[in-house]
Amino acid sequence: MSTVNCQLSTRTPMAPKFAKGRETMIYKMLVINPGSTSTKVSYFENEKNIFTESIFHDAPELLKYPTANDQLPMRRKVLLDFLGKHNIDPGDIDVFIGRGGCAYSQKAGVMVIDRQLVEDTAKDLGGSDHPAKLGVMLAYDLCKVYGGKMYTVNPTNVDELCDYARPTGIAGLYRRAQTHVLNQKGIAAIHAKKLGKKYEDLNLIVCHVDGGITITAHCKGKMIDSTEGAGGDGPFTPTRLGSIPVMEVLQYLDQGHTTGEMRAMLSRSGGFVSHFGTSDAARVHAMVESGDPKAVTIWNTMIYQLCKSIGGMAAVLEGRVDGILLTGGLMRYDDILRGVERRCGWIAPVTVYPGECEQEAMADAVLAVLRGDAKANTYTGKPVFSGFPWEREA
């Protein structure tokens, strides 16, 4: 594990550059969102999104890096190039906000980024090696040089799972909370507002469909079960292998493949990358539209597996589902919506929110903290779940 590449400093980040308690303060915020196939960067002044840019990285480029930590210099350059392109001095930024994950699981909300959080994130103490973690590491890296404050919001390993979602058939081995929390909770809140209801009053199945795909059961404001997308659970995706019977994995390893290769397939070289040599969904979908039989089969299998996971979450919610929400970059393809409506429309109304609201969700949540309307959590350095009572007593 190349944790040494996170380039942490022993220096304490510089003090904030803005005065406290000023209601008219304009907060300049940089929002950093590394995904499995892209780096999305936004510059906000309070609620106003001044600039947003998504820089896409194709699979061959990303496969040059053995781990997500190794991508840190490349992603940092993307950030600095973005700032330079828009003539933004990083020293003028008040707040650095990074998407996070891979540290110990925490509760939902805004969290202050500190050194322990960054170190635990770099070591993957709470989950799989996913590029989302780099948001926290980059925010810390920039803040320690240029000053300001730094936060993360609803990282990928927020844990609200119900007890039945945790155990497996191996004693002491548990399913983890690892999903697109930020976008899913943001879209769920938007949908609830659209209905004139509270998120906490609804039962929803929310699906993030992009380079990674996760499907989550939201019960009265809590994500009680979810596919663990970056852990080899749920549908395969442009970059991920999805659920595969363990016996097939063992046979694959017996054929001479390494655990390192298998780990890479969890989030970087599986799915479309394995089948087509690219994570570019546009290229694959163009093949589908041209009638390529392999592309048609693989693409529709992905939709089929998405629907299977939605059905499973409907059972988790005991059939009492107020809506199925589809969001993420791949929802620009209408055939995904049609496939879900055909197979799952009988469960609940299906609503599409193309793209995602992650940048706005992070900026709005942190702005509420800066204005004193909400409080930020502190990283505990301990997971939300560490075993059942009978195990801790043993």
What are these language model-derived features?
Residues 1-10:
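Arg/Gly-rich low-complexity intrinsically disordered repeat tracts
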Residues 321-341:
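Glycine-rich phosphate-binding loops at beta-strand->alpha-helix junctions
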Residues 133-141, 152, 167, 172-203, ...:
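Glycine-rich phosphate-binding loop plus the immediately following alpha-helix
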Residues 334, 338-364:
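Conserved phosphate-binding/catalytic loops in two-lobed NTP-binding clefts
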Residues 264-318:
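Adenine-nucleotide phosphate-binding core of ATP-dependent small-molecule kinases
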Residues 354-394:
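Structural signal for terminal/edge beta-strands and the immediately following C-terminal loop/tail
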